[in-house]
């Protein structure tokens, strides 16, 4: 069992029942999935950029990403319909818990000028989204193999349904929020 999941079951669940004043243990917010997305807009000119993004996401998550394609053509961006423009991975189960553990304990502290994550990145339905501007903060990414610095989006989806429940869950798991 992943370390963070064990912490969730033994420490976070009892604390969340008290903190959110829940009557049933099944009402406790829980993680559903984590989606890691990379938009490689420059891939329209150079296909090598998309290959790098796919390899980077595979190294970070340990799972093969799905290539995302343009839904419609936009001439101002020189974009054709069905052209590959990025990649994404949906993590569930043990891989999700292990990725979140590495994100909280290793990756986020390595971000330059880090002063805590914003509490405002919630969508009202219990999902927390954060953007990372440089992929080189991940220990799985080799700096020598990176030709261009790019970012990625991480969406943490919960079964909470409310921003308050999601924030409480992430704080109990050790997510470093701004004071």
Where in this protein do the model-derived segments appear?
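Ribosome-associated RNA-binding proteins
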Residues: 1-179
